[in-house]
Swiss-Prot record:
Subcellular location: Secreted
Keyword Secreted: yes
Subunit and interaction comment: Homotetramer. Dimer of dimers. In the homotetramer, subunits assemble around a central channel that can accommodate two ligand molecules. Interacts with RBP4.
GO cellular component, one term: extracellular space
Any single GO BP term: purine nucleobase metabolic process
One GO molecular-function entry: small molecule binding
Name assigned to this protein: Transthyretin
Position of the signal peptide: 1-20
């Protein structure tokens, strides 16, 4: 029964993450956006450090972009369509610092998502994460850029 409740909480959180945010956030012109929700408090995760890396031809990870989530738990403007070319990317969320700032000792040092972008044509990606001190889950919302949004 406890696992069922946890599953429902996670699903509800992911719905919140995909729909929460300021008016017009769904119309974002950003080709890569990050949304983070605190599952413990049921609110956006504010000031989460985000680092994005791009995999180089030699297999190393090169820094690509960085920032922190806003009061809405979102990070826009990480890159442009011109710079966000086909490739393998890694998004790393500094979950340890987030939980430590709240006085909680977390299990994970960070949460990461590794994905291939734009291999099927130009797309916009929203990486959504649901955080708790001992677990995290992620999902991606992938869409075609809207006409006139480029």
């Amino acid at each position: 029964m406890a696992s069922y409740r946890l599953l429902l909480l996670c699903l509800a959180g992911l719905v919140f993450v995909s729909e929460a945010g300021p008016a017009g956030a769904g119309e974002s012109k950003c080709p890569l956006m990050v949304k983070v929700l605190d599952a413990v408090r049921g609110s956006p995760a504010v000031n989460v450090g985000v680092k994005v890396f791009k995999k180089a031809a030699d297999g190393t990870w090169e820094p690509f972009a960085l920032g922190k989530t806003s009061e809405f738990g979102e990070l826009h403007g990480l890159t442009t369509d011109e710079k966000f070319v086909e490739g393998i990317y890694k998004v790393e969320l500094d979950t340890k610092s987030y939980w430590k700032a709240l006085g909680i000792s977390p299990f994970h040092e960070y949460a990461e998502v590794v994905f291939t972008a734009n291999d099927s044509g130009r797309r916009h990606y929203t990486i959504a994460a649901l955080l708790s001190p001992y677990s995290y889950s992620t999902t991606a919302l992938v869409s075609s850029p809207k006409e006139g949004a480029l």
